[in-house]
Design a protein with these regions (language model features):
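FAD-site-proximal beta/loop scaffold in flavoenzymes
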Residues: 49-51, 56-131, 222-226
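Short beta-strand-to-turn element immediately C-terminal to the catalytic PLP-Schiff-base lysine
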Residues: 77, 189, 201-202, 213-216
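A short, polar/charged loop-to-alpha-helix boundary motif
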Residues: 204-222
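A short, glycine/Asx- and small/polar-enriched loop/turn
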Residues: 42-48, 98-100, 152-153
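A Rossmann-like FAD-binding core segment of flavoenzymes
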Residues: 1-90
Length: 227
């Protein structure tokens, strides 16, 4: 059951989400998108009933919640540190809070209105803070690569950089092999020289190559679609 219009909406576009849904449903798993649960009550044909805002419902014997993260900022809030509107301890580029003697890293820290729900940004913050505590004010936290590579119920899924082409002038190259069940989208710069992001579903064999092009700013070949 997914609240958004598609699965993994942050990582995938509409085409990638549709293919992922198709592959999961082929495994015999029902997928319900655009469903907002309003109440969980006792079921008639199963133990539980999930009631949705569109007045439909789903009965099941077991419900497993996977609802993201919530920053644990109670101590910081009680101590008078600056807290974001939706939670999280506000930090600067050196992981320092509103009190110069207090620092925060990881999923409790709010950097430029962003909470990072992955472990990699926490490691980057830790390195930044370690450098700052050792007198290095040149090293700064400037964000983190949120690229993702995983298997979802056995289905390869990959997302790199600006996967939704939000960069001004960005162009798209799409490959959609319906028979093989492979989808790949490459987001490139307006001049065609830089890979800005990518989406892969069904086949991650190109992921590592595309990731290196995106992270290291490697100039794309004349025909990027050959990657």
């Amino acid at each position: 059951v997914e609240f958004a219009p598609r699965l993994m909406p942050v990582q995938l576009d509409a085409d990638g989400g549709a293919l992922l849904r198709h592959k999961i449903e082929e495994l015999g798993v029902q997928v319900h998108t655009e469903k907002a649960t309003t109440a969980i009550t006792e079921g008639e044909d199963a133990r539980l009933r999930m009631n949705f805002s569109d007045e439909s419902f789903l009965e099941t014997d077991l419900i497993v919640f996977s609802a993201g993260i919530r920053p644990q900022d109670a101590l910081a809030r009680a101590s008078g540190l600056e807290i974001g509107e939706r939670g999280g301890i506000v930090i600067d580029n050196h992981c320092t809070t509103s009190d110069p003697h207090v620092h925060a890293i990881g999923e409790c820290a709010l950097w430029e209105q962003k909470i990072f729900g992955l472990v990699a940004p926490g490691y980057t913050m830790a390195r930044t803070l370690s450098a700052a505590l050792n007198g290095d004010q040149e090293t700064a936290f400037t964000g983190a690569d949120m690229s993702t590579k995983l298997k979802l119920l056995g289905v390869d899924v990959g997302s790199i950089g600006d996967a939704h082409a939000q960069t001004p002038g960005a162009r798209n190259i799409r490959f959609n092999d319906e028979q093989a069940g492979h989808y790949r989208r490459m987001v490139i710069s307006e001049d065609g020289k830089t890979l800005l992001g990518a989406i892969l579903v069904g086949d991650n064999s190109h992921y590592d190559t595309l990731l290196q092009y995106a992270l290291n700013g490697i100039t794309l070949p004349e025909n990027p679609e050959t990657l």
